[in-house]
């Protein structure tokens, strides 16, 4: 009898979700109407293939809106994106998703806008255009040091290196210095000299377990680190590293040292001071650890990944490579002789290459769930009630041929034509609105400096991937599956 009652309840729930639910008017697979198994299948079982799966749904159903879970719609419409992702939006981040990653109170994952605003306005001055311009000499010094060390290892018969590993050493050291006032010395000692990046990779590889089985993750975080690491690999070490950094900042501040040698405070010096004007109070240590976790991830992988995409596509397109190298070598006075970031970022073809690389990489490529406000909204001329979760993936927008013709091709020239302004409006690599990426200016500084130095200095050849295809997975961040390896054929700064 109990089994029969359970069957009736399940059947009733099935019929309600498939036929009577407010979202039943939207197309999608039946399994998505009754459970979260469609998302789980692509995220976990098929390992980060959500983007491929959702793109197939939009094509198969010929609809800009598809149902991917009982109360969750995926939207592929750039105008809806601008409606949702705007300043003072009332489409708030969905707690089930953002609070699951293990750093729920960070500036990127906190869902309450009233808690987010004081935090953002307090740290935002560190990331303004003027503030970032002031970091350009330090950024160039780090890139120059990295390229000098790599060139010194050349035997004269060619020097091959993994682009992503090389760039991550730079971005990690730069970001850690900005955030905490110290580096891991990866540029000097090499990619494998510290466990930090390996544990970050392990955490990202397993991140979906925290979203789809949050109770497992919550249980794991209550255990000793050795056991936590078996359930959520990489997380415990990464958090330990963040604690160590914070403790060092506190110890330094206890000695009265609140500014670095460059005369600027670190990000954590700012976070460790109350700011009554911004209604900001120093949070608990646990919340500070969440901030460290987020900023360390964001500063390490996003720009190194986008720049790796750029290097691959530049070398995979001889005409692009030749035009870029010609522009950069003609500007060696502002790159090699005396680096001038303000002038470098005015270089038109380099700027176009960077925009196209960002379009094709989208460091946060997948769904960014938001909660529909109480008054509801219309999608595809159908009413969607408040409380519904809607997602829009930047990768789908960036691959839309109506916005970017021939989106599969790397075409920097598209950013130099008459449609550049409209395309700029739809460039969403860093998000839009109140919750857009705080580090956009810093990301551009890193990309401009790394690419201008590498291609002004070196003649490079693409060694792998040999099939000239770049493969990646959606693990919230892009996880690179292709190893981009290049060879230095000539060094124009040592001849």
UniProtKB/Swiss-Prot annotation:
Binding site for heme: 437
UniProt keyword annotation of Iron present: yes
PROSITE patterns linked to this entry: CYTOCHROME_P450
Cellular component per GO, a single term: membrane
Stored CDD domains: CYP58-like
GO molecular function term, any single one: heme binding
Needed co-factor(s): heme
Reactions catalysed: dauca-4,7-diene + 3 reduced [NADPH--hemoprotein reductase] + 3 O2 = asperaculane D + 3 oxidized [NADPH--hemoprotein reductase] + 4 H2O + 4 H(+)
Main location: membrane
Associated pathway: Secondary metabolite biosynthesis
Primary enzyme class: oxidoreductase
Transmembrane parts of this sequence: 1-21
EC number annotated for this UniProt entry: 1.-.-.-
Bilayer topology: Single-pass membrane protein
Glycosylation sites: 47
Entry's localization field: Membrane
Origin: domain of life: Eukaryota
Protein family (similarity comment): Belongs to the cytochrome P450 family.
Known role: Cytochrome P450 monooxygenase; part of the gene cluster that mediates the biosynthesis of aculenes, a unique type of norsesquiterpenes that contain a nordaucane skeleton linked to an L-proline moiety and are of mixed biosynthetic origin. The pathway begins with the synthesis of dauca-4,7-diene by the terpene cyclase aneC using farnesyl pyrophosphate (FPP) as substrate.
Entries under PANTHER family matching the protein: CYTOCHROME P450, CYTOCHROME P450 12A4, MITOCHONDRIAL-RELATED
The name this protein goes by in its record: Cytochrome P450 monooxygenase aneF
Organism expressing this protein natively: Aspergillus aculeatus (strain ATCC 16872 / CBS 172.66 / WB 5094)
């Amino acid at each position: 009898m109990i089994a029969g009652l359970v069957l009736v309840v399940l059947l009733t729930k099935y019929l309600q979700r498939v036929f009577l639910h407010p979202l039943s008017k939207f197309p999608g697979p039946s399994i998505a109407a009754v459970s979260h198994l469609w998302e789980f299948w692509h995220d976990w079982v098929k390992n980060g293939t959500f983007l491929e799966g959702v793109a197939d749904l939009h094509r198969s159903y010929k609809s800009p809106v598809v149902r991917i879970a009982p109360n969750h719609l995926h939207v592929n419409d750039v105008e809806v994106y601008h409606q949702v992702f705007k300043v003072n939006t009332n489409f708030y981040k969905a707690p089930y998703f953002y609070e699951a990653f293990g750093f729920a109170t960070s500036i990127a994952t906190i869902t309450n806008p009233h808690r987010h605003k004081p935090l953002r306005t307090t740290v935002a001055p560190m990331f303004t255009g003027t503030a970032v311009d002031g970091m350009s000499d330090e950024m160039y010094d780090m890139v120059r040091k990295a390229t000098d060390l790599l060139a010194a290892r050349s035997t004269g018969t060619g020097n091959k290196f993994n682009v992503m590993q090389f760039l991550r050493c730079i971005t990690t050291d730069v970001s850690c210095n900005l955030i905490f006032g110290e580096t891991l010395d990866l540029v000097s000692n090499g990619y494998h000299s510290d466990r930090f990046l390996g544990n970050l990779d392990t955490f990202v590889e397993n991140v979906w377990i925290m979203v789809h089985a949050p109770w497992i993750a919550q249980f794991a975080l209550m255990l000793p680190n050795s056991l936590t690491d078996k359930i959520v690999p990489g997380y415990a070490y990464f958090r330990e590293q963040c604690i160590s950094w914070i403790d060092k900042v506190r110890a330094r501040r206890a000695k009265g040292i609140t500014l670095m040698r460059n005369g600027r405070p670190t990000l954590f010096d700012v976070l460790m001071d109350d700011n009554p004007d911004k209604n900001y109070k120093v949070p608990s240590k646990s919340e500070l650890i969440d901030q460290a976790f987020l900023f360390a991830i964001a500063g390490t992988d996003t720009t190194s990944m986008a720049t790796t995409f750029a290097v691959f596509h530049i070398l995979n397109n001889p005409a692009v490579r030749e035009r870029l190298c010609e522009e950069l070598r003609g500007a060696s006075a502002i790159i090699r002789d005396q680096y001038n970031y303000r002038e470098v970022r005015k270089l038109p073809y380099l700027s176009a290459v960077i925009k196209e690389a960002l379009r094709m990489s989208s460091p946060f490529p997948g769904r960014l769930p938001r909660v529909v406000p109480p008054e509801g909204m219309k999608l595809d001329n159908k009413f969607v009630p408040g409380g519904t979760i809607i997602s829009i993936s930047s990768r789908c927008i960036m691959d839309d041929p109506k916005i970017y013709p021939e989106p599969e091709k790397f075409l920097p020239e598209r950013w130099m034509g008459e449609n550049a302004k409209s395309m700029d409006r739809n460039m969403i690599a860093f998000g839009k609105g109140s919750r857009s990426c705080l580090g956009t200016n810093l990301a551009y500084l890193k990309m401009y400096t790394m690419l201008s130095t590498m291609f002004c200095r070196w003649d490079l050849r693409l060694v792998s991937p040999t099939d000239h295809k770049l493969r990646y997975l959606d693990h919230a961040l892009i996880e690179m599956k292709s190893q981009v390896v290049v060879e230095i054929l000539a060094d124009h700064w040592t001849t």
